[in-house]
Amino acid sequence: MAEFVRAQIFGTTFEITSRYSDLQPVGMGAFGLVCSAKDNLTGSNVAVKKIMKPFSTPVLSKRTYRELKLLKHLKHENVISLSDIFISPLEDIYFVTELLGTDLHRLLTSRPLEKQFIQYFLYQILRGLKYVHSAGVVHRDLKPSNILVNENCDLKICDFGLARIQDPQMTGYVSTRYYRAPEIMLTWQKYDVEVDVWSAGCIFAEMLEGKPLFPGKDHVNQFSIITELLGTPPDDVIHTIASENTLRFVQSLPKRERQPLASKFTQADPLAIDLLEKMLVFDPRARIKAAEGLAHEYLSPYHDPTDEPAAEERFDWSFNDADLPVDTWKIMMYSEILDYHNVINDAQNLTESQ
Protein backbone atom coordinates (compact mmCIF):
# COMPACT_ATOMS: atom_id res chain seq x y z
CA MET A 1 0.00 0.00 0.00
CA ALA A 2 1.47 3.33 -1.04
CA GLU A 3 2.16 5.90 1.67
CA PHE A 4 0.60 9.31 1.04
CA VAL A 5 1.73 12.73 2.25
CA ARG A 6 -0.23 15.98 2.21
CA ALA A 7 0.75 19.52 1.26
CA GLN A 8 -1.22 22.74 0.87
CA ILE A 9 -0.75 24.47 -2.51
CA PHE A 10 -2.75 27.66 -3.19
CA GLY A 11 -5.24 26.52 -0.55
CA THR A 12 -5.63 23.17 -2.28
CA THR A 13 -4.70 19.90 -0.62
CA PHE A 14 -2.18 17.91 -2.63
CA GLU A 15 -2.21 14.30 -1.45
CA ILE A 16 0.59 12.44 -3.19
CA THR A 17 2.59 9.28 -2.68
CA SER A 18 5.87 9.54 -0.79
CA ARG A 19 7.64 8.84 -4.08
CA TYR A 20 7.32 12.58 -4.80
CA SER A 21 8.63 15.52 -2.80
CA ASP A 22 9.45 19.25 -3.06
CA LEU A 23 6.12 20.33 -4.55
CA GLN A 24 6.17 23.75 -6.23
CA PRO A 25 3.14 25.31 -7.98
CA VAL A 26 3.51 25.66 -11.75
CA GLY A 27 0.07 26.52 -13.07
CA MET A 28 -3.66 26.48 -12.44
CA GLY A 29 -6.33 25.59 -14.96
CA ALA A 30 -10.09 25.19 -14.95
CA PHE A 31 -9.85 21.49 -14.24
CA GLY A 32 -6.60 21.04 -12.34
CA LEU A 33 -3.60 22.38 -10.48
CA VAL A 34 -0.09 21.52 -11.69
CA CYS A 35 3.01 21.35 -9.48
CA SER A 36 6.59 20.45 -10.17
CA ALA A 37 8.04 17.74 -7.92
CA LYS A 38 11.10 15.60 -7.36
CA ASP A 39 10.64 11.92 -8.28
CA ASN A 40 12.58 10.22 -5.49
CA LEU A 41 12.58 6.93 -7.40
CA THR A 42 14.24 8.20 -10.59
CA GLY A 43 15.81 11.43 -9.34
CA SER A 44 14.16 13.41 -12.14
CA ASN A 45 11.86 16.40 -11.91
CA VAL A 46 8.25 15.80 -12.93
CA ALA A 47 4.94 17.61 -13.30
CA VAL A 48 2.10 16.46 -11.05
CA LYS A 49 -1.40 17.47 -12.14
CA LYS A 50 -4.23 17.19 -9.65
CA ILE A 51 -7.61 16.77 -11.32
CA MET A 52 -10.11 18.79 -9.32
CA LYS A 53 -13.20 16.83 -8.21
CA PRO A 54 -12.98 14.23 -10.99
CA PHE A 55 -16.04 12.37 -9.71
CA SER A 56 -18.29 15.34 -8.92
CA THR A 57 -20.39 14.99 -12.10
CA PRO A 58 -20.70 12.47 -14.95
CA VAL A 59 -19.35 15.10 -17.37
CA LEU A 60 -16.16 15.68 -15.34
CA SER A 61 -15.74 11.95 -14.77
CA LYS A 62 -15.95 11.29 -18.49
CA ARG A 63 -13.57 14.15 -19.27
CA THR A 64 -10.98 12.79 -16.84
CA TYR A 65 -11.40 9.26 -18.18
CA ARG A 66 -10.91 10.55 -21.74
CA GLU A 67 -7.73 12.42 -20.82
CA LEU A 68 -6.36 9.37 -19.01
CA LYS A 69 -7.07 7.08 -21.96
CA LEU A 70 -5.42 9.53 -24.35
CA LEU A 71 -2.32 9.96 -22.20
CA LYS A 72 -1.95 6.19 -22.02
CA HIS A 73 -2.39 5.77 -25.77
CA LEU A 74 -0.39 8.64 -27.28
CA LYS A 75 3.34 7.92 -27.34
CA HIS A 76 5.36 10.40 -29.38
CA GLU A 77 8.36 12.67 -28.84
CA ASN A 78 6.25 15.79 -29.39
CA VAL A 79 3.35 14.76 -27.17
CA ILE A 80 3.49 14.88 -23.37
CA SER A 81 3.95 11.40 -21.88
CA LEU A 82 2.51 9.85 -18.73
CA SER A 83 5.02 8.55 -16.17
CA ASP A 84 2.66 7.73 -13.29
CA ILE A 85 -0.96 7.99 -12.23
CA PHE A 86 -2.65 7.40 -8.90
CA ILE A 87 -5.84 8.03 -6.92
CA SER A 88 -5.38 9.51 -3.47
CA PRO A 89 -7.31 8.46 -0.34
CA LEU A 90 -9.44 11.58 -0.89
CA GLU A 91 -10.32 10.19 -4.35
CA ASP A 92 -8.52 12.88 -6.29
CA ILE A 93 -6.71 11.77 -9.43
CA TYR A 94 -3.12 12.75 -10.12
CA PHE A 95 -1.37 12.54 -13.49
CA VAL A 96 2.43 12.58 -13.40
CA THR A 97 4.22 13.60 -16.59
CA GLU A 98 7.64 14.75 -17.65
CA LEU A 99 8.47 18.32 -16.63
CA LEU A 100 9.45 20.89 -19.24
CA GLY A 101 10.80 24.24 -18.15
CA THR A 102 8.35 26.59 -19.83
CA ASP A 103 5.64 26.93 -22.45
CA LEU A 104 5.38 28.79 -25.72
CA HIS A 105 3.10 31.46 -24.25
CA ARG A 106 5.74 32.45 -21.70
CA LEU A 107 8.45 32.45 -24.36
CA LEU A 108 6.40 34.64 -26.68
CA THR A 109 5.67 37.18 -23.96
CA SER A 110 9.30 37.39 -22.87
CA ARG A 111 11.18 38.04 -26.12
CA PRO A 112 11.00 37.81 -29.94
CA LEU A 113 11.91 34.42 -31.39
CA GLU A 114 14.70 34.05 -33.91
CA LYS A 115 13.95 32.43 -37.27
CA GLN A 116 15.58 29.08 -36.50
CA PHE A 117 13.58 28.71 -33.29
CA ILE A 118 10.32 29.57 -35.09
CA GLN A 119 11.10 26.94 -37.72
CA TYR A 120 12.05 24.30 -35.18
CA PHE A 121 9.04 24.92 -32.96
CA LEU A 122 6.59 24.86 -35.89
CA TYR A 123 8.22 21.69 -37.21
CA GLN A 124 7.74 19.95 -33.86
CA ILE A 125 4.13 21.16 -33.55
CA LEU A 126 3.26 19.74 -36.98
CA ARG A 127 5.23 16.56 -36.28
CA GLY A 128 3.18 16.03 -33.12
CA LEU A 129 -0.08 16.87 -34.90
CA LYS A 130 0.66 14.41 -37.71
CA TYR A 131 0.93 11.66 -35.11
CA VAL A 132 -2.11 12.76 -33.07
CA HIS A 133 -4.29 13.07 -36.16
CA SER A 134 -3.18 9.68 -37.48
CA ALA A 135 -4.42 8.22 -34.17
CA GLY A 136 -7.89 9.56 -34.95
CA VAL A 137 -7.64 12.36 -32.39
CA VAL A 138 -8.32 16.09 -32.72
CA HIS A 139 -6.73 18.21 -29.97
CA ARG A 140 -9.29 21.06 -30.27
CA ASP A 141 -7.55 23.44 -27.86
CA LEU A 142 -4.12 24.05 -29.32
CA LYS A 143 -2.65 27.32 -28.03
CA PRO A 144 0.78 28.55 -26.89
CA SER A 145 0.16 27.68 -23.22
CA ASN A 146 -0.56 24.06 -24.22
CA ILE A 147 2.81 23.74 -25.95
CA LEU A 148 5.62 22.94 -23.52
CA VAL A 149 9.30 23.62 -24.23
CA ASN A 150 12.49 22.64 -22.38
CA GLU A 151 15.96 24.18 -22.31
CA ASN A 152 16.98 22.11 -25.36
CA CYS A 153 14.04 23.55 -27.33
CA ASP A 154 12.33 20.16 -27.33
CA LEU A 155 8.59 20.77 -27.68
CA LYS A 156 5.63 18.73 -26.49
CA ILE A 157 1.90 19.23 -26.97
CA CYS A 158 -0.08 18.82 -23.75
CA ASP A 159 -3.56 19.11 -22.23
CA PHE A 160 -5.74 16.67 -24.14
CA GLY A 161 -8.72 17.23 -21.85
CA LEU A 162 -10.82 18.64 -24.71
CA ALA A 163 -9.54 16.23 -27.36
CA ARG A 164 -12.14 14.42 -29.42
CA ILE A 165 -12.55 11.75 -32.04
CA GLN A 166 -12.18 12.65 -35.71
CA ASP A 167 -15.83 13.08 -36.60
CA PRO A 168 -17.41 15.13 -39.39
CA GLN A 169 -20.37 15.84 -37.06
CA MET A 170 -18.23 17.08 -34.18
CA THR A 171 -19.94 19.76 -32.13
CA GLY A 172 -19.21 22.27 -29.42
CA TYR A 173 -17.75 25.59 -28.48
CA VAL A 174 -14.12 24.88 -27.75
CA SER A 175 -10.61 26.27 -28.06
CA THR A 176 -9.36 29.58 -26.76
CA ARG A 177 -10.90 32.23 -28.99
CA TYR A 178 -7.73 33.66 -30.57
CA TYR A 179 -6.78 30.26 -31.99
CA ARG A 180 -10.25 29.01 -32.88
CA ALA A 181 -10.81 27.87 -36.45
CA PRO A 182 -13.56 29.68 -38.40
CA GLU A 183 -15.49 26.47 -39.07
CA ILE A 184 -16.07 26.11 -35.32
CA MET A 185 -17.53 29.61 -35.28
CA LEU A 186 -19.39 29.25 -38.57
CA THR A 187 -21.05 25.86 -38.30
CA TRP A 188 -20.86 24.69 -34.68
CA GLN A 189 -21.35 21.23 -36.14
CA LYS A 190 -18.87 19.92 -38.64
CA TYR A 191 -15.16 20.06 -38.06
CA ASP A 192 -12.19 17.74 -38.05
CA VAL A 193 -8.39 17.67 -37.71
CA GLU A 194 -8.07 20.83 -39.79
CA VAL A 195 -9.07 22.93 -36.76
CA ASP A 196 -5.71 22.05 -35.18
CA VAL A 197 -3.86 23.17 -38.32
CA TRP A 198 -5.64 26.53 -38.16
CA SER A 199 -4.65 26.87 -34.49
CA ALA A 200 -1.06 25.96 -35.39
CA GLY A 201 -1.17 28.63 -38.11
CA CYS A 202 -2.28 31.23 -35.56
CA ILE A 203 0.56 30.16 -33.28
CA PHE A 204 3.00 30.32 -36.22
CA ALA A 205 1.84 33.87 -36.99
CA GLU A 206 2.24 34.82 -33.34
CA MET A 207 5.82 33.52 -33.36
CA LEU A 208 6.53 35.62 -36.47
CA GLU A 209 4.79 38.76 -35.22
CA GLY A 210 5.29 38.53 -31.47
CA LYS A 211 1.60 39.03 -30.71
CA PRO A 212 -1.69 37.18 -31.36
CA LEU A 213 -2.86 37.40 -34.96
CA PHE A 214 -6.62 37.43 -34.28
CA PRO A 215 -7.19 38.89 -30.76
CA GLY A 216 -10.99 38.96 -30.84
CA LYS A 217 -12.89 40.52 -27.95
CA ASP A 218 -15.84 38.19 -28.45
CA HIS A 219 -17.20 35.66 -30.92
CA VAL A 220 -18.47 38.23 -33.43
CA ASN A 221 -15.39 40.46 -33.19
CA GLN A 222 -13.14 37.43 -33.63
CA PHE A 223 -14.74 36.51 -36.94
CA SER A 224 -14.67 40.14 -38.09
CA ILE A 225 -10.92 40.41 -37.40
CA ILE A 226 -10.28 37.23 -39.38
CA THR A 227 -12.18 38.59 -42.41
CA GLU A 228 -10.23 41.87 -42.27
CA LEU A 229 -7.09 39.89 -43.11
CA LEU A 230 -8.37 36.86 -45.02
CA GLY A 231 -11.36 38.46 -46.71
CA THR A 232 -14.96 37.26 -46.85
CA PRO A 233 -15.29 33.46 -46.91
CA PRO A 234 -15.95 32.00 -50.37
CA ASP A 235 -19.59 31.27 -51.22
CA ASP A 236 -19.03 27.50 -51.17
CA VAL A 237 -17.81 27.82 -47.56
CA ILE A 238 -20.68 30.11 -46.56
CA HIS A 239 -23.15 27.60 -47.97
CA THR A 240 -21.87 24.92 -45.57
CA ILE A 241 -22.98 26.95 -42.53
CA ALA A 242 -25.58 24.87 -40.70
CA SER A 243 -26.96 27.52 -38.36
CA GLU A 244 -29.45 29.90 -39.98
CA ASN A 245 -28.59 32.65 -37.49
CA THR A 246 -24.87 32.31 -38.24
CA LEU A 247 -25.58 32.27 -41.97
CA ARG A 248 -27.57 35.50 -41.76
CA PHE A 249 -24.82 37.11 -39.68
CA VAL A 250 -22.08 36.20 -42.19
CA GLN A 251 -24.18 37.33 -45.15
CA SER A 252 -24.84 40.67 -43.43
CA LEU A 253 -21.14 41.50 -43.18
CA PRO A 254 -19.56 43.84 -45.75
CA LYS A 255 -17.61 42.08 -48.48
CA ARG A 256 -13.88 42.18 -47.83
CA GLU A 257 -10.92 41.31 -50.02
CA ARG A 258 -8.14 39.06 -48.79
CA GLN A 259 -5.01 41.00 -47.81
CA PRO A 260 -1.59 39.67 -48.83
CA LEU A 261 0.04 38.21 -45.73
CA ALA A 262 3.37 39.55 -46.96
CA SER A 263 2.06 43.08 -46.36
CA LYS A 264 1.45 42.25 -42.69
CA PHE A 265 4.54 40.13 -42.05
CA THR A 266 7.03 42.38 -43.78
CA GLN A 267 10.12 40.88 -42.13
CA ALA A 268 9.16 37.23 -42.59
CA ASP A 269 10.80 34.72 -44.92
CA PRO A 270 8.70 34.37 -48.12
CA LEU A 271 8.63 30.61 -47.53
CA ALA A 272 7.17 31.22 -44.07
CA ILE A 273 4.46 33.39 -45.63
CA ASP A 274 3.69 30.69 -48.19
CA LEU A 275 3.24 28.02 -45.53
CA LEU A 276 1.20 30.35 -43.31
CA GLU A 277 -1.14 31.11 -46.22
CA LYS A 278 -1.72 27.38 -46.69
CA MET A 279 -2.53 26.94 -42.98
CA LEU A 280 -4.87 29.92 -42.66
CA VAL A 281 -7.41 28.97 -45.31
CA PHE A 282 -11.12 29.52 -44.64
CA ASP A 283 -12.16 26.28 -46.31
CA PRO A 284 -10.93 23.40 -44.10
CA ARG A 285 -11.10 21.09 -47.11
CA ALA A 286 -8.42 23.21 -48.80
CA ARG A 287 -6.29 23.74 -45.69
CA ILE A 288 -2.91 22.03 -45.66
CA LYS A 289 -2.64 18.85 -43.56
CA ALA A 290 -0.06 18.52 -40.79
CA ALA A 291 1.83 15.84 -42.74
CA GLU A 292 1.87 18.06 -45.84
CA GLY A 293 3.10 21.02 -43.82
CA LEU A 294 6.09 18.99 -42.65
CA ALA A 295 7.14 18.57 -46.27
CA HIS A 296 6.91 22.30 -47.04
CA GLU A 297 10.17 23.91 -48.13
CA TYR A 298 10.15 26.29 -45.15
CA LEU A 299 10.69 23.31 -42.84
CA SER A 300 13.27 21.58 -45.05
CA PRO A 301 16.11 22.09 -42.50
CA TYR A 302 14.29 19.69 -40.16
CA HIS A 303 12.04 17.57 -42.38
CA ASP A 304 12.92 13.87 -42.30
CA PRO A 305 10.15 11.60 -43.64
CA THR A 306 11.82 8.59 -42.00
CA ASP A 307 11.52 10.20 -38.56
CA GLU A 308 7.98 11.59 -38.57
CA PRO A 309 5.99 8.60 -37.37
CA ALA A 310 2.26 8.08 -37.55
CA ALA A 311 0.37 6.24 -34.83
CA GLU A 312 0.57 2.46 -34.94
CA GLU A 313 -3.13 2.18 -34.16
CA ARG A 314 -6.08 4.51 -33.90
CA PHE A 315 -7.44 5.51 -30.54
CA ASP A 316 -10.49 3.57 -29.32
CA TRP A 317 -13.31 6.08 -28.92
CA SER A 318 -16.02 3.49 -28.23
CA PHE A 319 -16.65 4.98 -24.77
CA ASN A 320 -17.20 8.51 -26.04
CA ASP A 321 -20.94 8.36 -26.69
CA ALA A 322 -21.65 6.58 -23.41
CA ASP A 323 -23.89 8.37 -20.93
CA LEU A 324 -22.89 6.70 -17.68
CA PRO A 325 -23.27 7.46 -13.96
CA VAL A 326 -20.29 8.65 -11.93
CA ASP A 327 -19.82 5.31 -10.18
CA THR A 328 -19.42 3.53 -13.51
CA TRP A 329 -16.85 6.06 -14.75
CA LYS A 330 -15.04 5.63 -11.44
CA ILE A 331 -14.84 1.84 -11.86
CA MET A 332 -13.61 2.28 -15.45
CA MET A 333 -11.01 4.79 -14.25
CA TYR A 334 -9.75 2.42 -11.55
CA SER A 335 -9.49 -0.33 -14.15
CA GLU A 336 -7.42 1.88 -16.47
CA ILE A 337 -5.08 2.87 -13.64
CA LEU A 338 -4.59 -0.76 -12.59
CA ASP A 339 -3.93 -1.70 -16.20
CA TYR A 340 -1.34 1.08 -16.49
CA HIS A 341 0.55 -0.12 -13.42
CA ASN A 342 0.34 -3.77 -14.49
CA VAL A 343 1.88 -2.90 -17.86
CA ILE A 344 4.65 -0.89 -16.15
CA ASN A 345 5.36 -3.72 -13.70
CA ASP A 346 5.43 -6.31 -16.48
CA ALA A 347 7.90 -4.17 -18.44
CA GLN A 348 10.13 -3.74 -15.39
CA ASN A 349 10.06 -7.46 -14.62
CA LEU A 350 10.95 -8.25 -18.22
CA THR A 351 13.89 -5.83 -18.11
CA GLU A 352 15.17 -7.27 -14.83
CA SER A 353 14.99 -10.84 -16.14
CA GLN A 354 17.11 -10.07 -19.21
Swiss-Prot record:
Give the record's GO CC terms.
cytoplasm; nucleus
Biological process terms in GO annotation: stress-activated MAPK cascade
Q: What is its main location?
A: cytoplasm
Record's subcellular location: Cytoplasm; Nucleus
Q: What SUPFAM superfamilies does the database record attribute to this sequence?
A: Protein kinase-like (PK-like) (SSF56112)
> What does UniProt list under activity regulation?
Activated by tyrosine and threonine phosphorylation.
State what this protein does: Proline-directed serine/threonine-protein kinase involved in a signal transduction pathway that is activated by changes in the osmolarity of the extracellular environment. Controls osmotic regulation of transcription of target genes. Involved in vegetative and pathogenic development like conidia formation, sclerotial development, and in penetration into unwounded plant tissue.
Q: How are the domains described in the entry?
A: The TXY motif contains the threonine and tyrosine residues whose phosphorylation activates the MAP kinases.
UniProt protein name: Mitogen-activated protein kinase hog1
